[in-house]
């Protein structure tokens, strides 16, 4: 084979390789462009509509004070309502609230009747194919509640040998049973049929400490007699929900939540509505 023939063959082999690889490169380029457009919001029609129309539509079940309810004047009020209003203010748009029964919230969201759900929502792992969830803005996990004079109780290990009140069958009851079974915690479990009953037991000195969720704790702890031990023993985040085709919208929500955590806005809401 002559030198020219060899060079011609090498060029031919290179061209074959190029034609084999070029389609793959084009496919990868198109996929990357698609991701970029998605990330830049070109495919988030919800965020685009909010910006163009100047209206954020928020769905909530307005029957859960102090997070959301309708007052005597017919106005939406509460912790979550303030979140929705602050989002709208941050984005320079108006906010319209819709009162929807809790069981119908996700249907309304998927039917595009609302843009976001802000309604003391727990993170539901079974819905993540259709729903995008924000970062947590409130932890409703289980907490210890103690009389002020029991300040030595600072963690769950400190209830060893103590009388602990829980609501019968509630998550706190299950948590305490698990701790006694798996970690060998020794405590006398006293049950009540409702939250008011176990708080009465604590206030009357019949138990040393109680465990309940953080929302219930704030509802019943008033004045100086009782104290909530922070941080919570478990994590039960409240989150904001958007449709799966609204990635830019939920990203903007997450940025707002991060800013609120840094500025103390969420602490202010807890102080206003819960404490």
Walk through the language-model features, giving the residues of each.
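Acidic, polar ligand-binding/catalytic clefts
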Residues: 37-40, 81, 85, 89, ...
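Bilobed "Venus flytrap"/periplasmic-binding protein-like clamshell domains
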Residues: 57-66, 74-89, 121-122, 143-197, ...
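Extracytoplasmic small-molecule ligand-binding "clamshell" domains
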Residues: 10-20, 38-120, 189-191, 253
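Periplasmic-binding protein-like
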Residues: 138-147, 214-258, 274-275
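Hydrophobic membrane-insertion alpha-helices, especially the h-region
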Residues: 16-34
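Ligand-binding clefts/hinges and TM-proximal coupling segments of bilobed small-molecule sensing domains
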Residues: 28-42, 171-192, 224-232, 257-275
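Short, Asp-centered acidic motifs that coordinate Mg2+ and/or phosphate
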Residues: 56-57, 111, 115-116, 132, ...
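Solvent-exposed, polar/charged alpha-helical surfaces in well-ordered, non-transmembrane soluble domains
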Residues: 48, 81, 85-89, 103, ...
């Amino acid at each position: 084979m002559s030198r020219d023939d060899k060079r011609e063959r090498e060029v031919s082999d290179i061209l074959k390789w190029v034609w084999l690889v070029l389609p793959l490169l084009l496919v990868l380029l198109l996929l990357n462009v698609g991701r970029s457009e998605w990330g830049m919001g070109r495919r988030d029609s919800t965020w685009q509509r909010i910006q163009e129309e100047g209206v954020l539509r928020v769905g909530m079940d307005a029957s859960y004070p102090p997070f959301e309810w309708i007052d005597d004047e017919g106005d939406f009020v509460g912790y979550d309502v303030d979140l929705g209003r602050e989002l709208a203010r941050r984005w320079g748009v108006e906010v319209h609230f819709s009162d929807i029964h809790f069981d119908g919230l996700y249907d309304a969201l998927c039917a595009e009747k609302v843009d976001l759900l802000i309604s003391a929502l727990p993170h539901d792992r079974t819905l993540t194919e259709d729903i995008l969830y924000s970062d947590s803005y409130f932890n409703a996990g289980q907490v210890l509640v103690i009389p002020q004079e029991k300040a030595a109780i600072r963690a769950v290990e400190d209830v060893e040998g103590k009388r602990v009140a829980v609501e019968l069958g509630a998550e706190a009851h299950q948590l305490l049973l698990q701790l006694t079974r798996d970690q060998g915690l020794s405590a006398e479990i006293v049950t009540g049929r409702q939250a008011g009953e176990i708080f009465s037991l604590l206030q009357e000195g019949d138990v040393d400490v109680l465990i309940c969720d953080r929302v219930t704790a704030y509802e019943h702890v008033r004045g100086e007699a009782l104290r909530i031990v922070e941080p919570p023993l478990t994590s039960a985040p409240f989150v904001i929900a958007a449709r799966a085709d609204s990635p830019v919208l939920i990203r903007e929500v997450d940025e707002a939540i991060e800013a609120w955590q840094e500025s103390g806005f969420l602490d202010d809401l807890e102080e206003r509505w819960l404490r």
